Swiss-Prot record:
One of its GO terms (molecular function) is pyridoxal phosphate binding. May also have succinyldiaminopimelate aminotransferase activity, thus carrying out the corresponding step in lysine biosynthesis. It catalyses: N(2)-acetyl-L-ornithine + 2-oxoglutarate = N-acetyl-L-glutamate 5-semialdehyde + L-glutamate. Its main location: cytoplasm. The modification N6-(pyridoxal phosphate)lysine is found at K254. One of its GO terms (biological process) is L-arginine biosynthetic process. Pyridoxal 5'-phosphate binds at G105, T106, F138, D224, E225, V226, Q227, T283. It comes from Caulobacter vibrioides (strain ATCC 19089 / CIP 103742 / CB 15) (Caulobacter crescentus). Binds 1 pyridoxal phosphate per subunit. This is Acetylornithine aminotransferase 2.
Length: 405
């Protein structure tokens, strides 16, 4: 495979925080990407669950162009009608009453964490600052978010960890109950389906149980649906699978903008009671350009056509991947996840396997627990899914041959 990406550019002036593949793209359409070398790839990464409707979706392109000719940015010191419209739509389709708009998922998580602590302060309990996440979680790269995740890879070397952040282990019910019952606990934060942690889907009864425990002890439940929300599980929001397990606060982003930078922190009126004037803010959050695209993306994603397609195609994927697992037990250990957030746990190194898939012109993402993730556009067709399976089959054959060599 060619490692060339451009004859006129280099990474010399780019901070070296990314382990990039030797590959660059110049255009895309739907689930297809065309490299700078002119080669076509089937994209089952979708910007890590961000290009929810694929690349250059005509409806989003049209809305973006129309809004770009009118107004890009004004300050939040003024009313922004496009922001109000998207907030209305999000609240009408979720548990939430109010929304704060950001530019990314990690900013939405930061807002959620601040909202939770401010709630208890407004209730006359400022000592309630402790926030518990779970092992294997990923909540973003800003400082509170990495402390909520607790992954040493993301927090080591940056000085003292923030006080008030700890992690729990799924299945350790005694520790979970004790944490929630503590008089200094402010909130629990959880991904209903973990993404970076290896596509681990939290059982619905666990989410319902968390909500019940939180309500008993006055603790707020925060869901991070930055990756698993916006239709990826076959419902608009992943929490909808757990009746009675809805959150008090939720962070969303990624597919909400269809690839355009956007994020949102959703909350009930009660949970957001402490977020009064000047409690939080954002320069670019809620700008008219992002809001116009977000509203258009939401309308398409929440449609029965899109959500039914996710259920149909993800069911096909799961069936076919389990077939590959049966045929290649020396390569595939497990198939897991929910909807189009699919994890495949491997025996060979997942990064090596990603290269084998890329050799077949298939793009897949890495994940924790030696998984690779399939995160295709929500409108992927059965034919495209079948093509992806055929490419994965060839990658499995190559992995087997490599191990035998």
């Amino acid at each position: 495979m060619s490692t060339a990406t451009s004859s006129t550019t280099s990474q010399h002036h780019i901070m070296g925080v990314y382990n990039r593949a030797p590959l660059a793209f110049e255009r895309g359409r739907g689930a297809r990407l065309i490299s700078t070398e002119g080669e076509e790839y089937l994209d089952c990464v979708a910007g890590i669950a961000t290009n929810g409707l694929g690349h250059a979706h005509p409806a989003l392109v049209e809305v973006l162009k129309a809004q770009a000719e009118k107004l890009w940015h004004v300050s939040n010191i003024y009313r922004i009608p496009e922001q109000e419209e998207l907030a209305d739509a999000l609240c009408a389709n979720s548990f939430a009453d109010v929304v704060f708009f950001t530019n990314s998922g990690t900013e939405a998580v930061e807002c959620a964490l601040k909202t939770a602590r401010k709630y208890h302060s407004a209730n006359g309990q400022p000592e309630r600052i402790d926030i518990y996440g779970f092992d294997g979680s990923f909540h973003g790269r800003t400082y509170a978010a990495v402390n909520a995740s607790g992954n040493p890879s993301y927090v080591d070397g940056f000085g003292p960890r923030l006080p008030g952040y700890s992690q729990l282990t799924f299945g350790d019910h005694d520790a979970i109950k004790a944490a929630i019952a503590s008089p200094t606990t402010a909130a629990i934060i959880v991904e209903p389906v973990q993404g970076e942690g290896g596509a681990r889907s939290i059982p619905t009864q666990c989410l319902v149980g968390l909500r019940q425990l939180c309500d008993e002890h006055g603790v707020l439940l925060i869901y991070d649906e930055v990756q698993c929300g916006m239709g990826r599980t076959g419902k608009l929001f992943a929490y909808e699978w757990a009746e009675g397990g809805e959150p008090h606060i939720m962070a969303v982003a990624k597919a909400l903008g269809g690839g355009f930078p956007i994020g949102a922190c959703l909350a009930t009126t009660e949970a957001a009671k402490g977020m009064t004037v000047a409690a939080h803010g954002s320069t670019f959050g809620g700008n008219p350009l992002a809001m116009a695209v977000g509203k258009a993306a939401l309308e398409i994603i929440k449609s029965p056509e899109t959500l039914d397609n996710v259920k149909t195609v993800s069911g096909f994927f799961t069936q076919q991947l389990n077939g590959l697992k049966d045929r290649f037990p020396d390569v595939i250990v497990d198939v897991r996840g929910k909807g189009m957030l699919i994890g495949v746990k491997l025996i060979p190194n997942n990064r090596d396997f990603m290269v084998l898939a890329r050799d077949e012109k298939l793009l897949i993402a890495g994940g924790g627990d030696n998984c690779v993730r399939l995160l295709p556009p929500l409108n992927l067709t059965i034919e495209e899914a079948s093509e992806a399976i055929a490419k994965l089959e060839k990658a499995c054959e190559a992995a087997r041959a490599k191990a035998a060599a």
